[in-house]
C-alpha cells in the first residue's frame, strides 16, 4: 500500500489494538488478510465494525485494510470500530461531530477489574457462614 492517498487510525478496546488504513475504493474490508465475513463469524461483530461507515454513508466508497492484535472477538470489533472512526476523522474532519454524537470517538476505557487477595474473583467473596 502506498501512503499517498490513504488515511490511518489506531483503535483500542479492552486488550485489543487495531491499525486501520482507509483509501478510496468500493467497500472491501480486509482484516488480517481475510474478509470481514470470514474473520467475524458473529453478525453483531460485523455490525459493530460497519457502524461508523454506515453513519457517514461511506460504506461502499472506501476500502479498509486492518490489522488487529490481542483480546477476544468483542474487544477486537470495538478496537476496529474505534480505529475506523479515527481514520475517518483524518480523512474528513467534518465527519467528527456526527461520529462524536454517535459515541464512536470516545475510547471505551473499561478494563477487567483485577482479582483481589482473599476473594474468589474481583468482587466475589467467599460464602459467609453465620454459625
From Swiss-Prot:
<dbReference type="InterPro" id="IPR020574">
    <property type="entry name" value="Ribosomal_uS9_CS"/>
</dbReference>
<keyword id="KW-0689">Ribosomal protein</keyword>
<dbReference type="InterPro" id="IPR023035">
    <property type="entry name" value="Ribosomal_uS9_bac/plastid"/>
</dbReference>
<dbReference type="Pfam" id="PF00380">
    <property type="entry name" value="Ribosomal_S9"/>
</dbReference>
<dbReference type="InterPro" id="IPR000754">
    <property type="entry name" value="Ribosomal_uS9"/>
</dbReference>
<dbReference type="InterPro" id="IPR020568">
    <property type="entry name" value="Ribosomal_Su5_D2-typ_SF"/>
</dbReference>
<keyword id="KW-0687">Ribonucleoprotein</keyword>
<dbReference type="GO" id="GO:0003735">
    <property type="term" value="F:structural constituent of ribosome"/>
</dbReference>
<protein>
    <recommendedName>
        <fullName>Small ribosomal subunit protein uS9</fullName>
    </recommendedName>
</protein>
<dbReference type="InterPro" id="IPR014721">
    <property type="entry name" value="Ribsml_uS5_D2-typ_fold_subgr"/>
</dbReference>
<comment type="similarity">
    <text>Belongs to the universal ribosomal protein uS9 family.</text>
</comment>
<dbReference type="GO" id="GO:0022627">
    <property type="term" value="C:cytosolic small ribosomal subunit"/>
</dbReference>
<dbReference type="GO" id="GO:0003723">
    <property type="term" value="F:RNA binding"/>
</dbReference>
<dbReference type="GO" id="GO:0006412">
    <property type="term" value="P:translation"/>
</dbReference>
Amino acid at each position: 500500500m502506498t501512503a499517498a492517498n490513504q488515511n490511518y487510525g489506531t483503535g483500542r478496546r479492552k486488550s485489543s489494538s487495531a491499525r486501520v488504513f482507509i483509501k478510496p475504493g468500493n467497500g472491501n474490508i480486509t482484516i488480517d488478510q481475510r474478509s470481514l465475513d470470514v474473520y467475524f463469524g458473529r453478525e453483531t461483530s460485523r455490525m459493530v465494525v460497519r457502524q461508523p461507515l454506515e453513519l457517514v454513508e461511506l460504506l461502499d466508497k472506501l476500502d479498509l485494510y486492518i490489522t488487529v492484535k490481542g483480546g477476544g472477538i468483542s474487544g477486537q470489533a470495538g478496537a476496529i470500530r474505534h480505529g475506523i472512526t479515527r481514520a475517518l476523522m483524518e480523512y474528513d474532519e467534518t465527519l467528527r461531530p456526527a461520529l462524536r454524537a454517535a459515541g464512536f470517538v470516545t475510547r471505551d476505557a473499561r478494563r477487567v477489574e483485577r482479582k483481589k487477595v482473599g476473594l474468589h474473583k474481583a468482587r466475589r467473596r467467599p460464602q459467609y457462614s453465620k454459625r
